């Protein structure tokens, strides 16, 4: 690597989020364009940079900086240039010249040690002298803090965040308890804090480390869908994480409990340990559900007469279970309606909507995802929104949702109907219930046999299994649905019955292939050539669903192959390498985590903004429309024309989406799905997963692979255990 010393003449571009900067550096007689992370550098400052020269295809020769060191200006010319650069507010070129003319090379010592002497310069009052000294000292303190933090391997961008949070306290915090960073600083997790702690010499059995490790293990468990862990399991996992004895971990539970960081709940012989936030979410959710469960006295004859009128007006014909669902909706403030595909959930919802519309009630419809909300709108004829949009997402704190609608500003409506409830996790459910005022009716609709939510909890399943709230199960498959082999076979799968694979169907096919590469070739032909014509859709509308991320038929490998086949490299398409992936303009991508602070806009073809909002969520899919290397941004257009500009630092939140996991497809519906099946772990390759995959298709399901694996999945009812206590909390709230 080469070294380059000089002064910063001009900052061309700076990304304030990550500190990435393009600047002109004057080194001797040369002016060089430098690129790198320079969060704290200002024009006029002297630096010594380490890096390499590179040739950018658009911007020419650049010096790519890996590290740099700020140098205090030493001669009068350098001092004057720095002071007059604008780095110190209140000092212009003329003032800088007067200061340096008076104090010469001693200028910085005077400012730092004898600032009162600055009044000797014309135009500087005592107050201004102190302001100048304060700014110079702040910059000196920041520079020293950066040097201190970087010895722990902390990046410049993160170092600035840490210093902005703690200021001069940073020295004590890093030497005594670096694990505070994991609690206080966005982007610092336990592992980062643990690395810093190791370099700071913190003992491996330090109470700070053990307690942070326990909380981190619970956080990891929530990412796997759990709201708590049994004590024995939590102890074992934390012991493995930290590499210390279980006894040391057990000793720290009481202190964490006293500090209300964890809640320890006894359930029979099992001790359940929650992060406090998840326990209170479950407890509050249970309480709020019970408060909404109000009984209304309405005569059977009155309800039946209204249903008959609706049937005559719409031509709909309800069966006894659907009629019962409407009656329960009228008589109760809270109702759950569950059933598989083709069992009449949509007809039931439509009847309920029209019933309460006749009563003059205001009705809100919502679903967890944009795709599910759009489908709800299409099937009901009424506007439906995402739950986040209904609750008026405002971005909240970093990493968490904040909603305008809550207990102090509830939704102004008489009835809320939520579809695809199997996707709703405990966090979103808690926020939803806070926004529903007492006396507002709530109807929850979903299929209990779908996969559970990606986020923590088993909300729909727990509500139904509590047997404490009103639930109607729809089981009859209606005649029009019974002609669809997708629906018929989905119910057979759910009942564990044999499914015919003779390919005599018009919408359900199984192509038997037994080698991964052959399966992939068939998938490619289906997606690009055969299915688009068959279902009248584009190749991008055909969704490949696979059980796993890794492996020969995993998401990662399939996406690379499908990208080359559907969106190959082209001189007209810009690309961005990111880790093992290449993003290309025209690629189909998916958001992989909830980001409540991402801003989106919907614009006309003339560039006028017609709508805007915040929040892009796990599973949202879109198309890359622009990659801009200079601005370090990538623009993605999601459903409904929502455009989002991603800075390069956020690209970890995106992945290619030609193929996605079955779990990620939950709540979505596609014209056709292709499901490659070969083999996999029995805990994953189960009936529940297969049922979810098959029910994602509207017009056609095509499975490609091993028929033995398909039949084994139908018979395999094993599932990974998900620890959730909402069922118990609901039962407790009844007592």
Task: Name these PLM-found stretches.
Residues 610-611, 618-735:
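C-terminal accessory regions
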Residues 448-614:
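Conserved helicase motor core of P-loop NTPases
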Residues 1-302:
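Accessory, non-ATPase domains that flank or precede helicase/AAA+ motor cores in DNA-metabolism machines
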Residues 335-377, 445, 508-515, 530-551:
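Conserved RecA-like ASCE P-loop NTPase motor core of nucleic-acid helicases/translocases
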Residues 87, 120, 339, 367, ...:
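The Walker A (P-loop) glycine that initiates the GxxxxGKT/S ATP-binding motif of P-loop NTPases
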Residues 44-46, 586, 619:
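Loop/turn positions that initiate beta-strands
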Residues 351, 355, 359-361, 370-377, ...:
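Conserved helicase motor core of SF1/SF2 NTP-dependent helicases
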Residues 266-340, 347:
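Pre-Walker A segment
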